[in-house]
Amino acid sequence: MRKYIAIIIASLALFTGQAHAQRCLPKMQGIEIRANMADGFNPGGNNGGYSFGAALSTYTKKGNKWMFGGEYLLKNNPYKDGKIPVAQFTAEGGYYFKILSDARKIVFVYAGASALAGYESVNWGEKVLHDGSTLHDRDAFIYGGALTLDVEFYVADRIALLANLRERLLWGGDTRKFHTQFGAGVKIIIN
């Protein structure tokens, strides 16, 4: 009898499947914090740009997700020996489709589209430049959208590292309409 029980226990131990993490379940929510470079990699130069953002993502069926958040983008435009800053403050709402994931649910790749609306400030509202020139671009409300390719890499059950590539298209302002962004971030699952 002992031999029979030992064989059953050994077979159960050997033939059981692995348990996988339960990630991206419907109604799970996470807070994302991101940092991006905008329009190329030019840190500290007269033509550099960067953005910071935070968002709340809520997962739906099949691992897709809704995303709602805000972002601050600063793009410096070269002017003679200086620069003219253009800042954008935007709110975002969008839907992302899961296009790829591994079997162990560690890496997820998403493609999504978002609607954006916000405010653009050119040279922080100052019309006269440092050399006495007058700036004709004005502050304005902006609106548009973004296409995003997003990768999540889970390092723990509730913590994921993020990488993203996105293209923003915004109307209403006097400056550039397109902004390409790439960057990294972290996501913390809150429920």
Stretches with model-predicted labels:
Residues 39-42, 77-84, 131-137, 169-173:
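Extracellular loop and loop/strand-boundary signature of outer-membrane beta-barrel proteins
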Residues 27-31, 46-52, 83-91, 107, ...:
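Residues that define the transmembrane beta-barrel architecture of outer-membrane proteins
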Residues 124-165, 188:
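Extended low-complexity acidic/polar segments
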Residues 73-75, 150-191:
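Predominantly the C-terminal beta-signal and adjacent terminal strand-loop region
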Residues 3, 25-29, 62-64, 101-107, ...:
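Short coil turns and loop connectors of transmembrane beta-barrels in diderm outer membranes
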Residues 20-75, 187-191:
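Short glycine/proline- and aromatic-enriched beta-strand/turn motifs that initiate or cap beta-hairpins
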Residues 1-28:
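Cleavable N-terminal export/targeting peptides
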Residues 55-130, 188-191:
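Gram-negative (and chloroplast) outer-membrane scaffold detector with strong preference
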